[in-house]
Amino acid sequence: MKPGKRIGLLILAIALVAVIGISVYRMYQGGTAVATVPSAPAAVTEPPQTAQTKTEPAPTPTAEPAGPDYGDPTAWAYFALGEDKGVDVFLICPTVDTRSERNAYDLNEKLRSNFLYALDLEKGIYEEAGRLYSPYYRQMSINAYRLSDPDREKAKELAYSDISAAFRWYLDHENGDRPLILAGFSQGAEMCLELLKEFYGDTAEGNALRERLITVYAIGWRVTEADVQAYPQIVPAQGERDLGTVVSFDCEDGIVAETIILPAGVKTLSINPLNWKTDGTMADRSKNLGAVMATGAAPIPGLCGAYIGDRGQLVVTDVTAGEYPPALDVFPAGAYHVYDYMFFFMNLKQNLSDRVAAYDQARRGKVLCRLLEDLLMAYEQPGSEDETHIEADLSAIQAISEADYPVAKSIADHWRQVYLDPAYALCCHGEGDLAPELADAGIPNERTHAFVVLGYELQNGEMTDELKGRCEAAAAAARSFPNAILVCSGGATGPNNPEKHTEAGLMKQYLIEVCGIEESRIFTDERAMTTAENAVNTFAIMKEQGIESMTIVTSSYHQRWGQALYNALAAIYEQQQGYHARLIGNYCFDTQPSVEVFLKDDWFAIYQLGEILGLPRAQMDQLPNVYALLGM
């Protein structure tokens, strides 16, 4: 017997097939999820039930019992379970009640064990994200599907009223503005969609919740175009890292025409968990990282492939209905609903990790971009609230990333020094061969100090007077500090440069042939095309050469910009690589220092700071356009 067949029969054996001689048509119309999870082992002592051998359902109480008190931790199957990583998972159990007539009014010990058994099957997907919360609730039982449409709807409403109350309690007492993942299978998936409808709409709270929603795993249920149109907050996932979206699919063999999950004439908006595409592109079994068929079982890599069919169903390949029977007779052979997350367990687990990482990156980008924006606005339009905004930004960064905080604070402090402090002076080279202006700057005359010379765009493959002026300033500094080195940076720039001369290459040649600087003292970066690339490339050279301090040599209008970028990179290098190069003073080519007025090109300093910080381009593109602000 094949391993898959043994696994399928094992699941069939432990399932309480407590259903169901119910009209499939009526279930199609009911719109509520059905139980599809094997019961707890304690139930195995009872014989499997079929449409011919059913236990009579427990009658509905005359007076409806009160729902759980979610202020009591015993009302939760999982309560803050797992390591606190700053992310929570609100996980909703699928149907496990096969006894009650309508709803699970009596959440007794046996039923609670069924809850835990079902949840433990799924837990491995989600537990590495952070704390898990899963409420006991008066869920719909299998037998509720025998009821009339109005009574069946009442059963769903009662089940959801508990989920809603639990979620409300969680938000008020446990969430603390944490990012959140909603997850559920089958009935649990439908309840996740109901939470989106109630809590995530266009309200102040809903908008805030959507900002913190990492994703929704609503597996084993349907998401229709009508749902999306009626509730814009329900956004079907389109890829493997999009945020605030719904991951949904339900598995079939490609032959099944309809199920209670996906009735005839209904199309669901699914995503393939193997290739994260929403079209019919086939993902072969090699993309399957591993099926997990029982709690603690070893993954089975490459068990099956999948593609999305014309009804939106996820068609599973490489397995058969005989190997993986439906386990519940409410489903036809070939309906793999019970295996929805089991087949793709390791892919879902990896995807959860990817989405959390994407969320962290996006959240980091937002707060860092806000800081950059406020620094820019503080310089362009000074106001009394600037410092308040900047400090609030730094506090927000510290709250989400202790690692980013020292870098962000260094950026803010240095920006305030070079851009906002009127006392900050630019040191400009005169016309002599030496640099007496640097005498009091505290620059060491050591091989461990570097003068970093930033390039300027070439014209017709040749140096401009401005670039020559920067070289003259650098040469004066080199003569005044004969033990220091020079690092020239700049790639092949400018129009009409067929021989691809580089700024750095021509600077080196000029410094040697015209200025008389020893070649052994000059190092070059001939790749940089932006100031940010100047910083990145020259830092690599300085680290290799054991440089401990540096002074930027450039034009006066470019000095503050360069200072901001090099300081940011210095902070990042120190944090990430343990390498520190201290910025000392500045040296400029100019007859007069630039006056403290806004220079339109300094907008790019902020943009390039974003590049150095690794912020997503889409977020940087949302920074205010300074040209527009100034009418330039």
Where do the protein language model's features map onto the residues?
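Flexible, membrane-associating and regulatory peripheral segments of lipid-active enzymes
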Residues: 2-124, 364-421
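Active-site catalytic motif of lipid deacylating hydrolases and related acyltransferases
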Residues: 30, 92-179, 321-342, 346, ...
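Short, electropositive alpha-helical surface patch
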Residues: 144-159, 193-196, 501-515
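Surface cap/lid and interfacial helix-loop subdomains adjacent to catalytic sites
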Residues: 164-176, 198-366, 605-625
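Alpha/beta-hydrolase fold nucleophile elbow
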Residues: 174-184, 522, 550
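Gly/Ala-rich beta-loop-alpha elbow adjacent to hydrolase catalytic centers
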Residues: 184-188, 192, 558
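Short glycine-enriched nucleophile-adjacent loop
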Residues: 192-200, 567
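A structural signal for short, hydrophobic/glycine-enriched beta-strand patches
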Residues: 375-392, 396-604
